[in-house]
Amino acid sequence: MGTVTLIGTFHEERGRVSSSELNEILKRVTPEVIFIEEPPSVWKGLAVLSKTKPLESAAISKYIETASAELVPVDLYTPPEPYVSHVREVLSYVERVSDTFCQLVDLNKAKMEAEGFSYLNGEFHEQVELAIRNEIVRILGLRKSDPFDRAYEAWRGQDERRE
């Protein structure tokens, strides 16, 4: 039976979270299969992926220059545009009204830049992400806005379906 290694990434370069670092991880792991966070229905290869997920695309492209790996798209679906704009609106609102949210997001960014993939794949990152989500829920609870609640629930539902 094979080994499955899950590597949490970020879709853009940020300090030590870089395509070169991810490529080094891939070289150490030597995967036979790389699962791509992309719905099979829209998968058109790495060239197209580079527009939405440049970090992963660059690392995988570099890796397969010298190694063989099957690329398998596995995401469930692409969320509709209203979903994306609603989530952006919710996050923008929470950012405007919550210093705690901003501090947590800044901490997340700083840790990614300084510690890279070891942070992204560690327990402390999970704790920070949970604190960010809890702060979003707290702020939305204060607002009592149906459109924001629906947008947040759609976002959480999307995350749950993907997990």
Where does each model-flagged region fall?
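Extreme N-terminal starter segment of soluble prokaryotic enzymes
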Residues: 1-5
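Short, flexible loop segments at the rims of nucleotide/cofactor-binding pockets, characterized by
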Residues: 10-15, 49-50
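Short, acidic/polar
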Residues: 17-27
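Structured catalytic-domain cores with a bias toward divalent-metal coordination
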Residues: 20, 30-32, 68-70
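Proline-aspartate-enriched helix->loop->beta-strand connector
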Residues: 26, 30-36
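Metabolite-binding pocket within alpha/beta catalytic cores that recognizes anionic/polar moieties
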Residues: 31, 41-48
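Short loop/turn segments at strand-loop or loop-helix junctions that form parts
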Residues: 35-41, 74-79
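Hydrophobic, often amphipathic alpha-helical segments used for membrane interaction and targeting
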Residues: 48-163
